[in-house]
UniProtKB/Swiss-Prot annotation:
Residues 242-470 form the CoA carboxyltransferase C-terminal domain. Pfam families: Carboxyl_trans (PF01039). The keyword RNA-binding does not apply. Induction: Does not show significant changes in expression throughout M.tuberculosis growth phases. InterPro entries: AcCoA_carboxyl_beta, Acetyl_CoA_COase_Trfase_b_su, ClpP/crotonase-like_dom_sf, COA_CT_C, COA_CT_N. This is Probable biotin-dependent acyl-coenzyme A carboxylase beta3 subunit. It comes from Mycobacterium tuberculosis (strain ATCC 25618 / H37Rv). The biotin-dependent acyl-CoA carboxylase complex is composed of an AccA protein, which contains the biotin carboxylase (BC) and biotin carboxyl carrier protein (BCCP) domains, and an AccD protein, which contains the carboxyl transferase (CT) domain.
Length: 495
C-alpha cells in the first residue's frame, strides 16, 4: 500500500500555514563511508535531512507539537541524530506545556548504527514519560508501516493511539521473521484492524478523519470547561418496591452507557482497551457532559439486554481508565451496570479477584474528581470496584448488592424463590442506598428509563455535569480526604 508522507500528514491535520519547524541541522555523528553515502542518497531522494521531522502547528487554533517519521528516508529508521531530534522536541513540548502528536512510520532501529542506535529508544521513552507525568496529552497516529523498536517505545506510549487503515503494525517485521524462521508470519495479525480488535490500539482512522478526531479529543483534553447548565429541581423519590427495580434494571431495552454517551454527551472519542486485549464488557471514552470534560468508564450491557459479566480483562481496562484520568487530571465518570463477575476457570486464572482489589484500592485513592453512577444492575465485586467515588448517583431503578438476589437467596435459603424477599431485606434499591449514605442523588425515571431513553440520558447528563463542576472547585487534598472519610464511615452509627 502507498505511504503517507510527513507533508501529507501536516497538510491533513494542521491549520493551513500554521506549521513551524523546530529542526536544526542533524547532529553530526561519526559514520562509515558506506553509511555516509546512504545518508547522502536518502537526502537527495527525499529532500529531508533525517528520518524525523519535528515542529509545532495548530489544530483548530490550538498549539500542538508534532513529531513525524519520513519512511522514505532509510525506512524511517531511528539512529542517534534522529533520536536526539525526537527527544529535544518532546522536551520542548513539555517545557512549553504543549500536547504532542507523534506519527511514526518506521522499520525501527537504524541497523547501520548498531547497538548505540538501539539504546536511543530509552531516552525517547524517558522524555515521553516525563511529558505524560507533566499531565500533557500524548497522541499517536501509527502510519504504514510501524515496526520494531519504534513501535515498542514511543509508538506505544500514547494516551490515545490510532492507526492508518490497513497499516502494517507489529514488533518484528514480517520479512525479517520469514528470513529468521523460514516461514511467513501469520497473515492478518500485524494489521491496524486486528490490533484494534484486540485492544492494542484505540482505533483505525483514515487520514481525512484524523483532524476532526483530534479536535474532539483536544476539546476534552485541554479546552476549558463550559459554564454549568441551569440546575435541575430535585424530584421526590417514589417508593418503588425493590423487586420492581431489579426487574426494570434487567429490561432488554434499558439504556446503557452507549446510549448515555450518544444522547447525553458531546465530543465523544471511544478508546479501545488496555494493550492486553480488549474487554468487550467495558467501554472507555473521552467525552463532555454539559460542557464538562471527563474520562468515561462504563460497564456495557449485553447485546439484547441484560447485564454482562465482568472478567479480569474488563477490570484491567477499568484500571487503564483510572490511570488515564489521573495522568491527564480529568474527572472520571464510572458507569456501573453489570450482572456480576465472570465465573470461570479463565477468570480465576486471569486474576479476577486481584483485579477487583486493585480497582477498588486505586479508585478510592485516585487523585482526580470521581463520579460513579448506578445505572442498572450493580452486582458483586465488579460493581464494588467501580463504586467508591467522590459522589455516587443512582438511576431510580439502579441497585447494588454483593450478589444477584437469586444468588443471595441460594446462600441463605438454599433456593432462589426468596430472591425478592431477600433483595428488600438487604436494602439494595436506590432509595435505601440514599438513606444509608452510599448514594448521594437519585436520577428519576418516568416511569422507567427504557420508556424514555433520550430524556433520561439528558437528565443523567445534567446531573453528571453538576457533580463534576462542583468537584473541580474543591482542592485535591480536601477532596481526597473527604472521600476517604466517607468510605471510612459507611455502616458506622451516625452522630
Amino acid at each position: 500500500m502507498s505511504r503517507i508522507t510527513t507533508d501529507q500528514l501536516r497538510h491533513a491535520v494542521l491549520d493551513r500555514g500554521s506549521f513551524v519547524s523546530w529542526d536544526s541541522e542533524p547532529l553530526a555523528v561519526p559514520v562509515a563511508d558506506s553509511y555516509a553515502r546512504e545518508l547522502a542518497a536518502a537526502r537527495a531522494a527525499t529532500g529531508a535531512d533525517e528520518s524525523v521531522q519535528t515542529g509545532e502547528g495548530r489544530v483548530f487554533g490550538r498549539r500542538v507539537a508534532v513529531v513525524a517519521c519520513e519512511f522514505d528516508f532509510l525506512g524511517g529508521s531511528i539512529g542517534v541524530a534522529a533520536a536526539e531530534r525526537i527527544t529535544a522536541a518532546v522536551e520542548r513540548a513539555t517545557a512549553e506545556r504543549l500536547p504532542l502528536l507523534a506519527s511514526p512510520s518506521s522499520g525501527g532501529t537504524r541497523m547501520q548504527e548498531g547497538t548505540v542506535a538501539f539504546l536511543q529508544m530509552v531516552k525517547i521513552a524517558a522524555a515521553i514519560q516525563l511529558h505524560n507525568q507533566a499531565r500533557l496529552p500524548y497522541l499517536v497516529y501509527l502510519r504504514h508501516p510501524t515496526t520494531g523498536g519504534v513501535f515498542a517505545s514511543w509508538g506505544s506510549l500514547g494516551h490515545l493511539t490510532v492507526a492508518e487503515p490497513g497499516a502494517l503494525i507489529g514488533f518484528l517485521g514480517p520479512r525479517v521473521y520469514e528470513l529468521l524462521y523460514g516461514d511467513p508470519f501469520p497473515s492478518g495479525v500485524q494489521t491496524a484492524e486486528n490490533l484494534r480488535r484486540h485492544g492494542i490500539i484505540d482505533g483505525v482512522v483514515a487520514l481525512d478523519r484524523l483532524r476532526p478526531m483530534l479536535d474532539r479529543a483536544l476539546t476534552v483534553l485541554i479546552d476549558a470547561p463550559e459554564p454549568l447548565p441551569a440546575p435541575q429541581t430535585p424530584a421526590p423519590v417514589p417508593d418503588v418496591p425493590t423487586w420492581d427495580s431489579v426487574v426494570a434494571s434487567r429490561r432488554p431495552d434499558r439504556p446503557g452507557v452507549r446510549q448515555l454517551l450518544r444522547h447525553g454527551a458531546t465530543d465523544r472519542v471511544l478508546l479501545s482497551g488496555t494493550d492486553q486485549g480488549e474487554a468487550a464488557t467495558t467501554l472507555l471514552a473521552l467525552a463532555r457532559f454539559g460542557g464538562q470534560p471527563t474520562v468515561v468508564l462504563g460497564q456495557q450491557r449485553a447485546v439484547g439486554g441484560g447485564g454482562s459479566t465482568v472478567g479480569p480483562a474488563a477490570l484491567r481496562e477499568a484500571r487503564r481508565g483510572m490511570a488515564l484520568a489521573a495522568e491527564l487530571c480529568l474527572p472520571l465518570v464510572l458507569v456501573i451496570d453489570a450482572a456480576g463477575p465472570a465465573l470461570s476457570a479463565a477468570a480465576e486464572q486471569g486474576g479476577l479477584a486481584g483485579q477487583i482489589a486493585h480497582c477498588l484500592a486505586e479508585l478510592v485513592t485516585l487523585d482526580t474528581p470521581t463520579v460513579s453512577i448506578l445505572l442498572g444492575q450493580g452486582s458483586g465485586g465488579p460493581a464494588l470496584a467501580m463504586l467508591p467515588a467522590d459522589r455516587v448517583l443512582a438511576a431510580l431503578h439502579g441497585w447494588l448488592a454483593p450478589l444477584p438476589p437469586e444468588g443471595a437467596s441460594a446462600i441463605v435459603f438454599r433456593d432462589t424463590a426468596h430472591a425478592a424477599e431477600l433483595a428488600a431485606a438487604q436494602g439494595i434499591r436506590s432509595a435505601d442506598l440514599l438513606k444509608s449514605g452510599i448514594v448521594d442523588t437519585i436520577v428519576p425515571e418516568y416511569p422507567d428509563a427504557a420508556d424514555e431513553p433520550i430524556e433520561f440520558a439528558l437528565r443523567l447528563s445534567n446531573a453528571i455535569a453538576a457533580e463534576v463542576h462542583a468537584l473541580r472547585k474543591i482542592p485535591a487534598p480536601e477532596r481526597l480526604a473527604t472521600r476517604l472519610q466517607r468510605y471510612r464511615r459507611i455502616g458506622l452509627p451516625r452522630d
